[in-house]
Amino acid sequence: MSFNCSTRNCSSRPIGGRCIVPVAQVTTTSTTDADCLGGICLPSSFQTGSWLLDHCQETCCEPTACQPTCYRRTSCVSNPCQVTCSRQTTCISNPCSTTYSRPLTFVSSGCQPLGGISSVCQPVGGISTVCQPVGGVSTVCQPACGVSRTYQQSCVSSCRRTC
C-alpha cells in the first residue's frame, strides 16, 4: 500500500505563489514505522497491520523554520503474552521555541503461550508485530509565534514483539 503526495495550490500565500509539495511515496508494512517525511505525508491511522494514509499535510505553505520536527522514542515492555509499547512524540516548532509532548500507548494482545511456557509467546493469527492503538492516536502541535496554522502529527506506530 502506498500514498503519493502531489503538487498543490497554496492559497494561503498573499502573493498567490505555488505550493510545491515534494512527492513522497510510503511503502508500508506492519513492521515498519513510517517516518514523519518532513511533515508532508503523515499516517492517519493504523489498522490490521497496514498504514491508512488518507490525507496530505501541506506544511510547505508555512515558513520552513516553523515546520515541526518529530522526534520518536519507542520502548517496549514485555509481560507473558502481552506487549505494551509506550511512545513519546515530541514536536518542536522553531522559531517558536515551544515543545509539545504527548505520550501514546499501544497494546498488542495477539500473543498466546508457546509450549506451556508463560514467558515465551507466539502470535495469534500469524500477527506478531502489530501494536493496536489504545485511546488517542494523534498529537496536535500549534506554534505559539503568531502562526495560526495547526500542525497535526498522526503518531501511530507498530512495534516488534519482544516476549
Curated annotation (Swiss-Prot):
An annotated GO cellular component of this protein is: keratin filament
Molecular function per GO: structural molecule activity
Protein name (Swiss-Prot/TrEMBL): Keratin-associated protein 11-1
* Keyword Repeat assigned: yes
Q: Which Pfam families match?
A: PMG
Where in this protein does the record put region 4 X 10 AA approximate repeats? 111-150
Summarizing the function annotation, the protein's role is:
In the hair cortex, hair keratin intermediate filaments are embedded in an interfilamentous matrix, consisting of hair keratin-associated proteins (KRTAP), which are essential for the formation of a rigid and resistant hair shaft through their extensive disulfide bond cross-linking with abundant cysteine residues of hair keratins. The matrix proteins include the high-sulfur and high-glycine-tyrosine keratins.
* Tissues where the protein occurs: Expressed in the upper matrix and in the entire hair cortex.
Q: Which UniProt keywords apply?
A: Keratin, Repeat
